[in-house]
């Protein structure tokens, strides 16, 4: 397999190894669901050796018959192979020469606790994690006003003006890459500035972005070129009709949010009926897929609306998008599906303890982006329904 994981194939070698320098918190945790008990093993960054700190490595390995799992905290960390962006390369790690009388000290703080479920265990971890690492103070390198000024400049510098269309580019290329912290999302802060110049640029971007790139189902393809034609890249090079679920979920949430912002700014007359119709078609596509499949998967077929690749939390942002769309379009069925999807996503998180599927370039690995997307969606549901359970679930995430 091209990513670090325990093997899904019974009997195959099954091992994960990672150096502490690649972790946000130096800890191995495990949860016994039957006993409702959890254990956390916190370590230092590594060992002190001849004036240097040598990273620990964390290793988890399953036996061939899967009857036992071994967890190792090694000193120093020497991985068998080094994980790359996708795949592995030869490990650069080296051991140390130990002489008679040398001492290696490994400090491990073990925390055992009762936990009724995975979210409870993770909440305990969040309470403990800073207690076992060296305290760090914030590094205030520049005032927030300067950060905002630089970000506005960065987005403005990517505004493309062509013979036919003009729009904000989310990447360093003259194409529209939808969603994924980019296309039809980077327009929100520009719209919030409130001036006429940025409003005009945002409107041009909506005209181009919403006027192109949609399949027959209402879902959008991942990328559209400056000629208005779909660009098939990544997995779509092999299977043309697929589109990343996460990108479409981002479009839905942020487009409804931006149309709401325009109305709050007293600029509702700037909202083109074509925008509203296209965004509603996208909301309808999410509803139709959910009714048919009971999930939005990792990828959808932009033409048929069927799930092309299953599993993951890739559609997390669509929960919030449908919740907003229910209010914007006065369409209760959107809220019905938003609630159903929120329950399915949260129940899966509560079972496995992570979310995944937001990043098209890391397969179905766990990621932080779906975690914050689902958190945002839960908060949106709380704000739109006042149901306190969504606030609690957002806190768990």
Which residue ranges define each predicted feature?
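Extended ligand-binding clefts on enzyme/binding-domain cores
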Residues: 211, 218-219, 241-246, 254, ...
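Solvent-exposed loop and edge beta-strand segments that line ligand/cofactor-binding
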Residues: 90-94, 165-183, 233-252, 298-317, ...
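Active-site neighborhood of glycoside hydrolase catalytic domains
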Residues: 315-352, 367-397
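Alpha-helical solenoid scaffolds that mediate protein-protein interactions
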Residues: 193, 202-210, 216, 258, ...
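Helix-capping and short linker residues that terminate individual alpha-solenoid repeat units
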Residues: 214-215, 263, 287, 291-292, ...
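Active-site lining segments of carbohydrate-active enzymes
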Residues: 233-239, 260-332, 395-397
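Extended glycan-interaction surfaces of carbohydrate-active proteins
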Residues: 150-171, 246-250, 291-299, 336-358
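Carbohydrate-recognition beta-sandwich/jelly-roll modules
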Residues: 1-277, 281-284
